Amino acid sequence: NVVFRGDGAEARKTLPYSQFDSQNPEDLWRALDAFSKETGAQVLAIPHNGNLSNGRLFNLENFDGTPLNKELATLRARMEPLMEVTQIKGDGEAHPFLSPDDEFADFETWDAANLNGTELKEESMLQFEYARAALKYGLKLDMEMGVNPFRYVMVVSTDSHTSMATAEEENFFGKHSGVEPEPGRWKHVTIEAQLDPKLSIIG
């Protein structure tokens, strides 16, 4: 998610930057930073679905595999000050593999594969997906390079794409417009997994 502070007049000063421009999040941060410097407008990106990133969200390397450097860590800290830690596609705060002594670490765990079901989950990925581990890595990076790219305000959200704040069960309109109330909505395939139909996102 990318949020512009102000009204449409600010947001219309730039074209939306999407994965069709680049799948490298560092390019998004650079584009937002350039927009902010050129216009004086404030903008931020909100990472989410860390639990479905297969170890990519809080990786300690740059997108190209080189070691994380202070420049990019500082840019990320500025562009991503907030994280959506829990939402409709599972919890991204803690995982029982990482916090085996915490009985609450297995809340709404969704850890079979990545978002599109194209890559199965491996235990080695988990430490780079969940907020608790990221906070620890952030403190370590702050000691090593003087900047913490994982210092977040955390929010919980529905991640609904219907623009409706209707998360209560008796008034739940679904995540997408395609699953608004109708008899077969619980069988609606939102994202069809390529590896195994059981990994598809339903509802």
Task: Name these PLM-found stretches.
Residues 1-203:
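Extended, charged catalytic domains and RNA/DNA-binding interfaces, predominantly
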